[in-house]
Amino acid sequence: MIRATKLAAVSALVLVAAAAAAQDDGFTKKFPLASCQFISVGGNRYFPLIPGRQLYYSNAACVAAGKCDALNELWITEERETKRITLPIGGTTRTVVTRVVQERETEDGELVEISRNYFANCWPSRDVYYFGEDVDIYKNGKVVGHESAWLAGRHGARPGIVMPEDGFITGSRYYQEVAPDVALDRAEHKRTGFATRVPAGRFDNCLEVEETTVLEPDDIGHKTYCRGVGLVKDDDLELTAIYANPRPDDDNDNDNEDDDD
């Protein structure tokens, strides 16, 4: 999920070294999945899952300041669609209904990527888990690749946590993606309890997360999440507008479903 970071080609030697480093790197990668009753709506206060909501991000301020060469834009849409993902949990096979969240990225108006991400809320902890993503990379209007795509339950991939419920402790470390050789993004809590201002407004009760991956150790990203809103900053991208259009029956979780096959 690190923006603009897609693994195109990694040598066998690098992959072996990365796998070894991931074995015991101080980041939690095993989670109490068996105790979860997964649902596809709700989320938590720092990562809401609200079908019909769309958030728009831009680095226009960075461009205007002369610090960025290209205008990058990102639309995150929490779809009404769900996806059923079957995977082994706690010694048995379970099917989890996940929320589809689409990310659409452009650079200077040209489409560069569309990804469909799959999240579910663990009840009663309200930790939001990440179950994978389908990725389309674009060039000149055509799909040219699917780098970094993964799905829990396939090829040894397991869910990671994208955002824990309010148990945000500075210094906490955990894996967001657990897909060997493909996606091994990690999160570390850096600071909390501050306010931030972006084009969409001023937000309180914010927290900062640093993201890294053993596959590309020099790539470091920073995200800011604010209570009641979710992602507000993604490196130089800033939340610019929120479009909310939920249906009254969204909480019934009767959306159209897509199987994992």
Which residues make up each language-model segment?
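Hydrophobic h-region of N-terminal signal peptides that target proteins for export
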Residues: 13-21
